[in-house]
Amino acid sequence: MAQDLIKEQLQGVNLFLIGMMGSGKSTVGPLLAEQLGYRFFDADVLIERVAGKAIADIFAEDGEDTFRDLETEVLGHLAAQTRSVIATGGGVVLRRQNWSYLHHGLVIWLDGSLELLLARLQGDEARPLLQVENLEERLGNLLAQRQPLYAQADLRFPLQADQDPLAIAGELLATIPGLLKPQCSAEQN
């Protein structure tokens, strides 16, 4: 019943999940979408489909700028959708143009601490930006660069180490109504 009310209040507005890699956007997103009866899109998966290769290969063969161009293109298409939960890449906030797309929906920042992200990303060989000697230093630098940009989100959701993804989705659903403007009836206009 509460979910029906939230769906009605959202009126099909997209939810964009932002945050650092390892924050759980691709894990929480489908759970949130399912509870809302929304579609789920993982922007990184779509970028790979458009490019016809893995993100690591895009970085290696074409460079980060090409990846960011593809990311912006895919985000533009996703922003035109409705009733969708969209997990974005961690660096989506770096381009001003991307914010114009993100503002087509409700932007939710899954905020993980450096310690949490380190624990989740240790040994991850799939993420090109993390293929460095000192993972903690790299993550710390990326976090410092991106936190002020993530802070522009409509909602900041601080993550805890042992939080269940389903519980996170539930807490987000409980928080969303407070972010939405009350609907005016025709009689009030």
Swiss-Prot record:
InterPro entries per UniProt:
P-loop_NTPase, Shikimate/glucono_kinase, Shikimate_kinase/TSH1, Shikimate_kinase_CS
**Record's Gene Ontology CC terms?**
cytoplasm
Q: What is the enzyme's class at the highest EC level? A: transferase
Q: What is its EC number?
A: 2.7.1.71
What UniProt keywords are attached to this protein's entry? Amino-acid biosynthesis, Aromatic amino acid biosynthesis, ATP-binding, Cytoplasm, Kinase, Magnesium, Metal-binding, Nucleotide-binding, Transferase
Can you tell me which residues bind substrate? D44, R68, G90, R146
* Cofactor(s), names only, from the UniProt record: Mg(2+)
Q: Which residues bind ATP?
A: G22, S23, G24, K25, S26, T27, R127
Subunit comment: Monomer.
In Swiss-Prot or TrEMBL terms, this protein is called Shikimate kinase
The lineage is: Bacteria, Bacillati, Cyanobacteriota, Cyanophyceae, Synechococcales
